[in-house]
Amino acid sequence: MVVVFENKAEQEVLGSPDAPYLTSLSASGARFTEFRAVAHPSQPNYLALFSGSTQGVTDDSCPQLLGGRPNLAQRLMSAGCTFVGHSEDMPTAGFTGCTDSTGRYARKHNPWVDFANVPASSNLPFTDFPRICPGCRRSPSSFRAFAT
């Protein structure tokens, strides 16, 4: 599981009464507190984290259509694992728009949507995470990520 905090300091989230589940997860995992951006603005960093490369993307424009290029989800699925990405403020499962009607969701934080070799069924709202993810504790063949 990878949890990405953007625009919030770690201490604003972990230990917060509004984030008990994330706080409980942090106690049993590795924390990469020195991870730094490879580019600015946001989107190239999410692509680099997810695929090992910025894919030549230098801005937050939408959509990026990156076809079947190698990425974390594709590699996990090729190894018999599962991948599900959860995105904060995404309005519905499988949503591929650039933003929602409120302007709170931004696809630039959701890199798996840009790759044709990641199934649309892997793209879920953050609100589904607490309901679905408890099973990932028991299953070593599951990987879940979400962006904030």
Residue spans for each PLM region:
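N-terminal pro-sequences and low-complexity stem/linker regions of secreted or lumenal proteins
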Residues: 1-148
